[in-house]
């Protein structure tokens, strides 16, 4: 298992949290996704053999949030 913290500067409310966590929960291999509204980050615990960072970023961006290049 790997843990990735992804900065998402546009996070600002509970709707953002619900939207992003819900999108990540649908990805096979994601064990847990947690949005920190105050820090504007998403922490994801996932099986790196099943999913990669690119898929996580894509799921966040599909919800309408920009993820800056790392």
Residue map of PLM features:
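Flexible metal-binding regulatory segments at protein termini and peripheral loops
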Residues: 1-70
């Amino acid at each position: 298992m790997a843990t990735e913290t992804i900065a998402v500067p546009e996070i600002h409310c509970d709707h953002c949290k619900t939207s992003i966590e819900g999108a990540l929960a649908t990805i096979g291999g994601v064990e847990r996704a947690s949005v920190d509204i105050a820090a504007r980050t998403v922490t994801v615990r996932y099986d790196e053999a099943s999913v990669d960072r690119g898929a996580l970023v894509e799921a966040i961006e599909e919800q309408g949030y920009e993820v800056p290049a790392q």
